[in-house]
Amino acid sequence: MARITILPDILCNQIAAGEVVERPAAVAKELLENSIDAGARRISLSIADGGRKEIRVVDNGSGMHPDDALLALERHATSKIRSIEDLQAIGSLGFRGEALPSIAAVSRFELVTREPDAVAGTFIRVEGGVVREVRETGSPAGTRITVRDLFYNVPARRKFLRAADTETAYICDQFQRLAMAHHAVHFQLINRERTQYDFPGAASPEERAGQVLGAETLKRAIPFCVENASARLRGMVGTPDLQRANSHSLFVFVNGRPVWDRAVNRAILAAFESLIPRGKFPVAVLFLELDPLHVDVNVHPTKREVRFKHPGGVIDTVRGAIRDALCHLRPLHGSAAAAPRPFSETADQRAFRDSLVREGQLSFDRGRPLSRPPGFPSERWRERHRPDAEPPYPLLREPAPTENPRREAGSPPAAPADSLFDEGAAPQPDNPDTDFFAEPKRAAGGPASTHAPVTVDTAAFADAFQAFEAATHLHAGDVPALAELPVIGQLANTYILLEAPDGLILIDQHAAHERIIFDALSFPAGGPARQRLIRPAVIDLPPRDAAMLRRWLPLLEEIGVEIESFGGDSFVVHAVPAPLGECPPEGLVRELLASAIEGDDAPRWNVLGRLAKTAACHRAVRAGQRLRPEEIRLLLEGLDRTRFASTCPHGRPVWYKMTLSDVARLFQRT
């Protein structure tokens, strides 16, 4: 066996470079972070050939003393920390003193730097970790670092680099994330001698997010801000329809540092769980500020990952803040349908009408406006369907008796199930007092939460949300209510067809009803309304299922199932959620129990969502089921009152719109 020996410094630096310098993007990241730590207000990044040929960073920061410039090329030489206490409370992006020597060990490296009050600057040239030249030079205040021929002396690493465009994409991602984290700094990226990004210093993180993500994305983003004794979380999330195919749209920053934390990402996805399809990702920008003592950034070679002292509290805060922000999305229409907007002919409609005139299929003049567009509700239809009008259909039954709190024990039972829909099952109107950050209810004797209560910065949120509403026009009168549109009929007893002013709307009846029931179970303040059973149902379970049910009784209570032990392995059901009032209690409880067991190791809020999904799917009308006109109307009215009418709880689309232009293209009309 060979004797143990100490490796030479050059080899040590090349080994260290394998951890720190994974690819050109890692070089760009380390150099940009050094510029930010130096207090630069303007930073320029230039690359060539995806960073393999050249990476150059120029800043107007504090610069370095000549002695410090040479010392910075030694391993573990840094100005950021002096003691273990400094490491535990680190606030800078860099602190290990590994980046510059590691980069210089695998490239042809040049450093030019000057302090603001120095007469001359310092030039240092390094090749493969060996200092070749040191001299004075003229230069502006700040630092310029040039890295050429990356991995020229490590062929095994160089051959595994991807194509230039791919490496450029990685660099752009790092550049955008650091630019997003430090909005006041002017960032510029030059690729192949052409400016690819130029982000002037912004007044706020939201303004910088608009520069990076684009103005259209910013218009469809919902801001939020929450704060507690130990942390502050602010940011924005895109509306559910703003989906992406990958997770590159998730931007998470902890104390100004871009990080990739699986738990935080899962919390973001959990907040959108019932709003976007599985495999899709939302747009989210999160800025988390907390005591440096509560987060460890020294757990990954590239400082990409962090470890939280209280991960559960962070995850709950992230999910709750996003979910609360999404719940402030108003329904397109309130409990009473909004008055339709006056009709004005759109460009698509004019083009469609003109094509018919040209082909002799329409007799009116081109310049003559339509008195009422095809498919728009007539005055008679509107009057007949006013929210306060008498029901036009004699078969429409009254809502089943519901209670929240419970109905009187002597009340008469609900009417037989003549209709598939119950107006009492509609979601409750927005309640500004709903607090998604309140301490969860716990059973008597259960452990109290150890996390400090979270308070919402209502003033900041209100200002931001008013701006958001003004930009996105989420007001009730902006879109005609679905219930006010003429119903063409059902297609294959599965899809409801509506005639819109500018086209055709197809609605998946099962997905729409699922969304209505899910929101009724999930979002009303105080929990969903309950329907008390005239005759309590007794359920006998196998011992294993009985033990599991005892564990999940508080969760079943939260979604509206009132159930208690009846001795041994028997249970008695006294009430069920009003939207599920016609479901057999035994079958409902067994199905909910199976869903809870399937998510046994999931967080409490995840299991609650799973239970609500199961209940909604169990109760919703099926594809292929014929609906009466009054049932279709009730479904459309419920959809108008729903916050997230565009998707079902599983993230599938509820409706699809074909404009007149889409139809014209199908028939090759121009």
From Swiss-Prot:
Give the species this sequence originates from: Syntrophobacter fumaroxidans (strain DSM 10017 / MPOB)
Residue ranges of the region described as Disordered = 363-451
Lineage, top ranks: Bacteria, Pseudomonadati, Thermodesulfobacteriota, Syntrophobacteria, Syntrophobacterales
Q: In which residue ranges is the amino acid composition biased (Basic and acidic residues)? A: 379-389
Q: Name one GO biological process term.
A: mismatch repair
Q: Name one GO cellular component term.
A: mismatch repair complex
Q: What does this protein do?
A: This protein is involved in the repair of mismatches in DNA. It is required for dam-dependent methyl-directed DNA mismatch repair. May act as a 'molecular matchmaker', a protein that promotes the formation of a stable complex between two or more DNA-binding proteins in an ATP-dependent manner without itself being part of a final effector complex.
The record's family statement is: Belongs to the DNA mismatch repair MutL/HexB family.
Q: Which SMART domains match?
A: DNA_mis_repair (SM01340), MutL_C (SM00853)
Q: Which CDD domains does the UniProt entry name for this protein?
A: HATPase_MutL-MLH-PMS-like, MutL_Trans
Descriptive protein name: DNA mismatch repair protein MutL
InterPro entries linked: DNA_mismatch_repair_CS (IPR014762), DNA_mismatch_repair_MutL (IPR020667), DNA_mismatch_S5_2-like (IPR013507), HATPase_C_sf (IPR036890), MutL/Mlh/PMS (IPR002099), MutL/Mlh/Pms-like (IPR038973), MutL_C (IPR014790), MutL_C_dimsub (IPR042120)
Gene (UniProt)? mutL
Keywords of this entry: DNA damage, DNA repair
Molecular function via GO: ATP binding; ATP hydrolysis activity; ATP-dependent DNA damage sensor activity; mismatched DNA binding
- What Pfam family is a match for this entry? MutL_C
